[in-house]
Amino acid sequence: AQDYLIRGQLQDALVHRILDYNIQLKQAREQIRHLSNRDTLTGVLNRVGFRAHLERAMDRSKRYGFNTALLYINIDQFTNINDNYGESDGDVMIKTISQRLVNKMRSTDSIARLGGDEFAIVLEDVNSTAGVELITEEMLKSISAPMLLSDQQVAVEASIGVAICPQDGGGFSDLVEHARSAMQQAKCIEAMKALNAPHSVMLLEIDAVNMYDTAAENMGKVFISTE
């Protein structure tokens, strides 16, 4: 009888260990899945996570009839900053900008780092172009706020291209290409230069302090795709 009792206790202990192992295995898999969708430097979505989020947002947009906006963001002159201050300070800048963007987002929005100095933000359920313009302007102001790198005050410029689903493309690749193209056009604009491009309907200017602490007018630029 005692042997039977011991065997029963051992079996119970084994069952508990198996259950604990399965729980830990499930948690480990969830952790791996989560990390596989995240940028290691900033903790925001990476390209893989970005694609999944944008495709889901576009599906909801088509199903429920609301607009989804894609903001494609490039940090201007980041290579020069990286060269002048070093990769460590470059990483600090990227993390700082990432956090600033996160702080300006709504709970329904998502952000991804696409690599290097490029970010993407998905804005769901946007009611109007004017609303997108307001959000984008706030993003530019936040990015251009001075930050300290190696005890020097540095401000950066950014260019943002905007595309809106469904009118600018119903597929992932089309929408991203429209937003990226609009960003590249914005990047070419100089201060006070008139706009005359297929995508452009708006330009936002942001005054900022340049990286050498002398007064200068730098520009954050936005194109909204209208194709």
Q: Which sequence ranges carry the predicted segments?
A:
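N-terminal membrane insertion elements
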Residues: 1-26
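Cyclic nucleotide signaling catalytic output domains
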Residues: 6, 111, 138, 142, ...
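Hydrophobic/aromatic docking surface of two-component receiver
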Residues: 8-10, 125-127, 167
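The C-terminal output helix
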Residues: 19-33, 186-190
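Amphipathic HAMP/coiled-coil signal-transducing linker helices
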Residues: 28-45, 59
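Conserved long alpha-helical elements within nucleotide-processing catalytic cores of c-di-GMP signaling
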Residues: 46-69, 76-106, 112-116, 120-121, ...
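Short hydrophobic/aromatic beta-strand micro-patches
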Residues: 122-124, 163
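C-terminal capping/lid region of NAD(P)-dependent oxidoreductase domains
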Residues: 212-226
